[in-house]
């Protein structure tokens, strides 16, 4: 064993003794790598980043741009402040012409992922998230250096996490704006009806934790602002309440320069109805999803049909615009009820140009929105008011921020947690409005007054000073 005596363990002391200070520099550099990568990586590949004196906002909508009016209104408002606007979303329907023609707005399509292979829900959801991840990553990379990224919530998965992570790592000067239309976890709860369900609680935590990293949070109601402060512990200084207001395309009939009769005679939806001038016209808009129970309306209309002759009520035409997963079920129920010619129900998918025109000739509108959270408001009522049309609406916590009973509309006494029959309430308010001309005229005047409150003025008052800038 004597020949192996020269092999002795000496530890690492000799390494430090003979290596010199360069080793310490190497160790220090190694330990600093995460920090260096986080701070310098965004600047190592600057090709393609947005730069210049004019500011840029990138708006992401995981929905159809043609039917996302609030986000399109944001785009127009930023454009008027001389921002470059990158507007990203689905292009299932053509966006409004004023968006297409705006020289400051560029539209970038996001491909709709459809379940053409009839995959189970979980597998399809996973596939959709992966596809959206790469699409969003590509767009974010193209817009790296944008001054602001504006997203809507819901949906929050996967877009909130992807956008936030990208900004924090690759585009750290970019500020994140979240426009809270509703709470995503409450929509998921429509499926489970249990706020303590693990998936619902996970999604609530996801929204609460990630939402706090936003630089600005915009809410559609004051109640939603209070919720974010009290329940999600958001900084109230970062929250702006921006109520929906109608765009310029929604105008009362008196402002259109055309008569009601001319519209009734020219549009296909009215042409096959005998004596259309005798009918009261109702309108409603829906996406045919579970949060709007159209069985309530059908039941009320059935009661109206059965009592029309006895109570001297006028015949009605109700136009329901929109499409969605429960549309075929709704149309089948209409067929089964076999309404008389005194109650005509039509479903139409209208263009963004035709929709305001049809609203303008209505006598009354109906909203069945109850809100999964109770603290959002339906854009459809804002559109109705823009055309000067009063509304019958179901009661829920935030509805008073938009509709005042007996002034610009009528609100049911019941809500979804009440023992009062909601369909009976809708029927009662319908007959009350059409039997009492004085009441109908009063709420009509109130709706016309609401039509004077416009998006542009409201946006400039609440948002303009925060986002205006000078190119000098």
Curated annotation (Swiss-Prot):
Keywords attached to this entry: Endoplasmic reticulum, Glycosyltransferase, Membrane, Transferase, Transmembrane, Transmembrane helix
GO molecular function: chitobiosyldiphosphodolichol beta-mannosyltransferase activity
Signal peptide: none
GO CC annotation, single: cytoplasmic side of endoplasmic reticulum membrane
Lumenal topological domain: 1-20
Annotated EC: 2.4.1.142
Taxonomy of the source species: Eukaryota, Fungi, Dikarya, Ascomycota, Saccharomycotina
Entry-linked InterPro entries: ALG1-like, Glyco_trans_1
GO biological process, one term: dolichol-linked oligosaccharide biosynthetic process
Originating species: Debaryomyces hansenii (strain ATCC 36239 / CBS 767 / BCRC 21394 / JCM 1990 / NBRC 0083 / IGC 2968) (Yeast)
Entry protein name: Chitobiosyldiphosphodolichol beta-mannosyltransferase
Pfam families: Glycos_transf_1
TM helices/strands, residue ranges: 21-41
The family this protein is said to belong to: Belongs to the glycosyltransferase group 1 family.
């Amino acid at each position: 064993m004597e020949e192996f005596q020269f092999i002795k363990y000496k530890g690492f002391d000799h390494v430090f003794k003979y290596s010199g200070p360069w080793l310490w520099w190497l160790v220090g550099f190694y330990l600093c790598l995460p920090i260096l990568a986080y701070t310098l990586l965004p600047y190592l590949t600057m090709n393609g980043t947005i730069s210049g004196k004019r500011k840029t906002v990138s708006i992401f909508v995981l929905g159809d741009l043609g039917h996302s009016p609030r986000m399109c209104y944001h785009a127009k408002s930023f454009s008027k402040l001389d921002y470059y606007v990158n507007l990203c979303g689905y292009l299932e329907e053509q966006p409004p012409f004023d968006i297409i023609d705006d020289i400051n707005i560029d539209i970038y399509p996001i491909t709709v992922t459809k379940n053409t292979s009839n995959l189970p829900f979980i597998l399809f959801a996973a596939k959709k998230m992966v596809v959206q991840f790469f699409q969003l990553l590509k767009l974010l990379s193209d817009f790296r250096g944008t001054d602001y990224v504006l997203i809507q919530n819901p949906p929050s998965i996967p877009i909130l996490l992807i956008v936030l992570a990208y900004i924090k790592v690759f585009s750290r000067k970019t500020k994140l704006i979240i426009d809270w239309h509703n709470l995503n976890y409450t929509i998921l709860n429509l499926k489970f009806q249990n706020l303590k369900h693990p998936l619902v609680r996970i999604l609530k935590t996801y929204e609460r934790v990630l939402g706090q990293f936003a630089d600005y949070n915009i809410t559609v109601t004051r109640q939603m602002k209070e919720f974010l402060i009290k329940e999600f512990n958001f900084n109230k200084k970062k929250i702006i309440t921006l109520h929906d207001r109608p765009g310029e395309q929604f105008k009362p009939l008196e402002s259109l320069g055309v008569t009601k009769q001319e519209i009734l005679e020219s549009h296909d939806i009215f042409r096959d109805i005998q004596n259309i001038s005798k009918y009261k016209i109702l309108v409603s808009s829906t996406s045919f999803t579970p949060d709007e129970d159209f069985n309530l309306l059908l039941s009320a209309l059935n009661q109206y049909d059965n009592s029309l002759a006895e109570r001297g009520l006028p015949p009605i035409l109700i136009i329901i615009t929109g499409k969605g997963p429960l549309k075929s079920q709704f149309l089948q129920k209409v067929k089964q009820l076999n309404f008389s010619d005194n109650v005509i129900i039509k479903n139409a998918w209208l263009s963004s140009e035709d929709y305001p025109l049809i609203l303008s000739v209505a006598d009354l509108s109906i909203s069945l929105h109850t809100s999964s959270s109770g603290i959002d408001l339906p854009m459809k009522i804002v559109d109705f008011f823009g055309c000067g049309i009063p509304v019958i609406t179901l009661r829920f916590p935030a509805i008073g921020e938009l509709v005042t009973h007996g002034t610009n509309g009528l609100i049911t006494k019941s809500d979804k947690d009440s023992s009062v029959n909601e369909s009976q309430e809708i029927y009662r308010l319908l007959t009350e409005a059409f039997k009492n001309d004085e009441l109908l005229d009063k709420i009509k005047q109130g709706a016309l007054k609401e039509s004077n409150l416009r998006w542009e003025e409201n946006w400039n008052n609440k948002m303009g000073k925060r986002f205006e800038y000078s190119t000098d």
